[in-house]
Amino acid sequence: MKKFLILAALLLPLASVAQQYKVTGKVPTKTKVYLFRTPGFVKEQADSVVAKNGTFTFTGTTTQPELYYIVKKAAKTGQPATIVPIVADGNVVVDFTTETPSGTAENDALKAALMQVKPYAQGLRAVEKQFEDLELSGKEPSEDELTKLADSYEQAQALMIEAVAAICKNNMDKTYPAYFIIDYYSLIEKPTLYKFYDEKAKFMQPSATSHVSQLIEGWKRREPGQTFTDFEMEDLSGATRKLSDYVGKGNYVLVDFWASWCGPCRREIPNVKALYDKYHAQGFDVVGVSFDSDKAPWLNAIKKMNLPWHNISDLKGWKSKAAALYGINSIPSTLLIDPQGKIIATDLHGEELETQLNTIYEKSDVASMPNK
């Protein structure tokens, strides 16, 4: 009896770890159906089956309920695939007609949420269609037409995001809102996302939303008032440099995240050069952090644009340690750091950056600061 109890105690954690799921649905015989997972920003195919007798089935186990996608490719070339999000948890039924899941409490709730958001998504799509029709007409739209369409788009988007945020706020103990976090995190206000993260909402726990959690951690590191987080990369000569070699040394420093292939980055550089020329003698400095993956284009761009400041890179593209560290998912992006190493502003460009630097260097104590 004692041995049985010990064995049962050892097996109990294993039983709680492995959770089985079964996904079924109806499609025409011989239709190929796919199961995708989202361990990052890109969905990855994990399994596929060919329907038999008008049905398909996926089975598997997870350590916790996870968000997956069931995909049926279109019968005709050029048509979009049908994608249904599911929570892999128990017996799930996929309906490709309504593009919804059901069968468990999580999936029934996800179905209801999808139906709730659908009218808002349709409203947004209707405005997008008006933009497309206007472009295809070949007519030059008036300023008034463009303003009205832009306002309509913003209003439709705001209504949809309000609905999405409410679904998440009211279901902190559920997994299924992970679908909305993945699709709409970039539009949800950061304080709201921070709340979900800080309060450990269940939908922030699956692997599907881990990349969003990592972004939030990075965003927090770049909040104004935070001390910069150090990292190492190589300079043009191949020597290892730390960000702290240039930052927190008594001068204001702009850390400019860019890449040679980034058109908006290169268009912004003349503005930065003008400000560098204007204020460098008073201590202003720039550190260019490239998200290039090949050294030659990086070096050529620096030479062609005659960049006079410090330049570093780990040549890992979007897998750059700086991207993960500071939650950067688009460039150009900047950090303006004060003489003590505190971040005072982020993503300043053009006139905004010029105004900020003008304000800083109008102060007599800064104006008299010696160059580094």
What are these regions (language model features)?
Residues 1-24, 364, 371:
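Bacterial Sec-dependent N-terminal signal peptides
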Residues 19-159:
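A non-transmembrane, solvent-exposed segment enriched in polar/low-complexity residues
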Residues 232-253:
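A short beta-strand-turn-helix
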Residues 257-274:
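Conserved redox-active cysteine motifs that mediate thiol-disulfide chemistry
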Residues 299-340:
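Short, internal strand/loop/helix patches
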